[in-house]
């Protein structure tokens, strides 16, 4: 991590994600070693909010999570931010209510990847219209080789995406794309971001062509 920070410079944003994999003792050791690496955020360094609260006693690095338990976050003082997909919260309207509650409680929020172009268009609009979201949101666009919208898949330029300006969400459902993706799902099953069916046993190289 120190080598990465040195290579990208002090000003580049660096976020980490352990996907709840570390034990509390391991996380303590890791965070102690990278405390001076200017880490913007560490996502789910441990498996529970309770462990995260104990970890907070040993590190000032901000924590985030995909688990939308605001009540427990307020009680324990961690995580600092929620990173949530709109479908988890039940759609745009419920997401806006959740963000408003986060703001009232002083807990940060940014968006997890919208996956398809429809979900991504939704979170682009919400991010643009919601002042409480002031950190860059996540995306998995580099993994996408197809989409269900005529305008997709989205391709960021210099790490930025414009907000769609057409009516509604600003994107158009592609019936052909939907059929194509449906047939692929039936044939290959749930999409695996890591497995490349063209190269069994090897990880996909990013970005996908």
Give the predicted meaning of each segment.
Residues 38, 47-62, 68-168, 172:
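Shared catalytic-loop signature of beta/alpha-barrel
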Residues 6, 57, 125, 179-180:
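Charged/polar, solvent-exposed surface patches and flexible loops
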Residues 34, 102, 130, 181-185:
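Alpha-helix boundary/capping residues
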Residues 24-26, 50-51, 92, 177, ...:
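Active-site-proximal flexible loops/turns
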